[in-house]
A protein has these predicted regions:
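Non-catalytic, C-terminal membrane-associated alpha-helical segments of glycosyltransferases
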Residues: 74-82, 93-146
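Residue-level signal for well-ordered alpha-helical scaffold segments within enzymatic catalytic domains
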Residues: 19, 23, 43, 85, ...
C-alpha cells in the first residue's frame, strides 16, 4: 500500500474530491501565502474526512528561489497575519493572542536591536512582522501587496 493517512499536507500538490466541498468554500480567500492549506486540511478533518499522502508519488517542485527585499517584507507581513487569523478562526481570539504573543515580543526586540545597530533591511523585516500582527489584531483583512 502506498498511501498514508495524515492530518495535514503542504499545498504545492493536492488533489481533492470536489463533490465533498459543495456545501462550503474550498480555500478561505482571507489567507494569502500562508496557512491556507492548514486551514483547509483542518476543516476536512473536522468533517471526519480523510487526507492521504501517496508515499511513492514524485513531484517536480522548482522551489528555492531567492526573494527580492520587497517580497521578503511581504512574506513576513503575511506569515504573522495568517498565523493570527488561523488561530483566531479555529481556536478563538484569546488563544490567537496567546499563540502570537512570543512572536510579537520577539519581533519587537529584534526590531529595536536592528534599529540600534543600523541594519535597516533586518529592521524592516521585523517591522513588517509587527505590522502583520497589528493588522490581524485590529481585524483588518490580509491587504498588504507589492
Amino acid at each position: 500500500d502506498n498511501t498514508l493517512s495524515v492530518d495535514s499536507i503542504d499545498g504545492f500538490s493536492m488533489l481533492f474530491n470536489l463533490k465533498k466541498f459543495k456545501d462550503q468554500n474550498f480555500f478561505d480567500e482571507n489567507f494569502f501565502l500562508y496557512l491556507e492549506n492548514n486551514d483547509l486540511c483542518l476543516r476536512v478533518k473536522q468533517k471526519n474526512e480523510n487526507i492521504f499522502v501517496v508515499t511513492n508519488a514524485m513531484i517536480n517542485h522548482k522551489g528555492s528561489i531567492s526573494l527580492s527585499e520587497n517580497l521578503e517584507y511581504l512574506r513576513n507581513w503575511h506569515w504573522m497575519w495568517s498565523k493570527f487569523y488561523f488561530n483566531k478562526k479555529h481556536y478563538g481570539f484569546f488563544v490567537a493572542i496567546k499563540n502570537i504573543f512570543l512572536n510579537f515580543i520577539s519581533a519587537l526586540i529584534k526590531y529595536f536591536f536592528y534599529l540600534i545597530i543600523f541594519k535597516n533591511k533586518k529592521k524592516k523585516i521585523y517591522e513588517m512582522r509587527i505590522k502583520g500582527i497589528i493588522n490581524a489584531l485590529i481585524g483588518k483583512k490580509s491587504w498588504f501587496r507589492l
